[in-house]
């Protein structure tokens, strides 16, 4: 049965339709891009973006600052979801278990506040998501006593983390393009199935910077490494361009669902064939809906909202109308979306419990991390 995907509600339908068209352009084969005045104008804009990016990168070299701590950056080359947040969680737990005093630094996209600060790990989540950003609020909820700090300028929030929490290792969430801060380890994530899209930089393509800039990375992590053929093809492409660059493959494993954010665990087997409505306001909502269908959930309707979208009263009404119209048992959303929801809605949704899994690459990845961080051990209390 084909899932009916609704592109948001009200004015957000136009935004999501435009977003879907842009993604089709970005991930089409380069040779299929037809000429014309509009495409020529977009190409010119893409060239201008690239020139501006290079200018900013060169300028940043002269004002880069170093924190008195080991700095690990988790970033990507393309816009959209590649799984930075699950890897950030994995790294924070790994380094903490190894005896490091870890702090996570996030920009706090879309937050209402402006001053750098620590994200509380408890409180009304929808309020915290508004003040600090949805991803930092989710990170703080998941990491508990591992501090998460937000701030536009990572050096300022990093100093705050070091002085307030005595952090000796900081993780930059989405840090590859943050040139103002020196880092000791740059990890870049790529989608194993289609790492570069059409190969162009914004706005003609999905790349934040050219492929050649992967030379700055210390290692590459291929996410969504599900199809062996895609992984092998992407590995071969990277090995040819960057022969000495370590490449690790990982995929996101669904451990189960929670009845409400942080609620009781619902086994996967109990979700099979149950009628459901889903919604997501993330960069690539279709991948989330496809995951649910792959689990054989009877997904009858799905709502795709703009990235970081905070549901309105109209959205909530549309969701409950869909549940009634489809005779659905379940209302499913992502963890990032759940932290933005008002309390009553957050308690009734089903939220997937996703983890990053390196499979056979895990031992090699752990050894790589240990080797890179050796000699920069935790400072004594």
Curated annotation (Swiss-Prot):
Keywords: ATP-binding, Kinase, Lipid A biosynthesis, Lipid biosynthesis, Lipid metabolism, Nucleotide-binding, Transferase. InterPro entries: LpxK, P-loop_NTPase. One of its GO terms (cellular component) is plasma membrane. It comes from the Bacteria. ATP binds at residues 78-85. GO terms for biological process: lipid A biosynthetic process; lipopolysaccharide core region biosynthetic process. The keyword Plastid does not apply. It is an enzyme of class 2 (transferase). Pathway: Glycolipid biosynthesis; lipid IV(A) biosynthesis; lipid IV(A) from (3R)-3-hydroxytetradecanoyl-[acyl-carrier-protein] and UDP-N-acetyl-alpha-D-glucosamine: step 6/6. Pfam families: LpxK. HAMAP family: LpxK (MF_00409). Transfers the gamma-phosphate of ATP to the 4'-position of a tetraacyldisaccharide 1-phosphate intermediate (termed DS-1-P) to form tetraacyldisaccharide 1,4'-bis-phosphate (lipid IVA). This is Tetraacyldisaccharide 4'-kinase. It comes from Syntrophobacter fumaroxidans (strain DSM 10017 / MPOB).
């Amino acid at each position: 049965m084909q899932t009916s995907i609704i592109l948001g509600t009200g004015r957000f339908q136009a935004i999501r339709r435009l977003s879907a068209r842009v993604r089709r352009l970005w991930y089409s084969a380069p040779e299929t891009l037809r000429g014309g005045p509009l495409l020529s104008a977009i190409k010119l804009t893409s060239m201008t973006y690239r020139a501006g990016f290079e200018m900013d990168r060169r300028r940043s070299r002269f004002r880069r600052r170093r924190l008195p701590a080991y700095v690990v950056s988790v970033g990507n080359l393309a816009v959209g979801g590649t799984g930075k947040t699950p890897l950030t969680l994995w790294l924070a737990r790994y380094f903490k278990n190894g005896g490091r005093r870890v702090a996570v630094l996030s920009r706090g996209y879309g937050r209402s506040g402006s001053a750098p600060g620590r994200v509380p790990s408890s409180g009304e989540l929808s309020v915290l998501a508004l003040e600090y950003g949805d991803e930092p609020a989710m990170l703080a909820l998941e990491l508990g006593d591992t501090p998460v700090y937000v701030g536009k300028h990572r050096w300022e929030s990093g100093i705050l983390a070091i002085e307030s929490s005595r952090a000796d290792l900081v993780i930059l969430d989405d840090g590859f393009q943050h040139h103002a801060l020196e880092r000791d380890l740059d990890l870049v994530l790529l989608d194993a199935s289609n790492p570069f899209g059409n190969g162009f930089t914004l706005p003609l393509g999905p790349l934040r910077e050219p492929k050649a800039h992967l030379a700055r990375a210390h290692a590459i992590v291929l996410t969504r490494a599900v199809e062996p053929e895609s992984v092998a093809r992407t590995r071969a492409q990277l090995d040819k361009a960057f022969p000495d660059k370590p490449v690790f493959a990982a995929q996101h494993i669904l451990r189960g669902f929670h009845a409400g954010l942080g609620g009781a665990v619902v086994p996967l087997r109990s979700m099979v064939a149950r009628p459901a409505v889903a919604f997501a306001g993330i960069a690539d909502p279709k991948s989330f809906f496809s995951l649910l269908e792959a689990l054989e959930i009877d997904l009858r309707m799905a709502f795709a909202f703009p990235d970081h979208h905070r549901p309105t009263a109209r959205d909530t009404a549309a969701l409950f109308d869909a549940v009634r119209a489809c005779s659905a048992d379940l209302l499913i959303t992502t963890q990032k979306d759940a932290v933005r929801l008002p309390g009553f809605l957050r308690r009734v949704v089903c939220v997937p419990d996703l983890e990053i899994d390196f499979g056979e690459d895990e031992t090699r990845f752990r050894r790589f991390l240990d080797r890179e961080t050796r000699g920069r051990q935790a400072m004594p209390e």
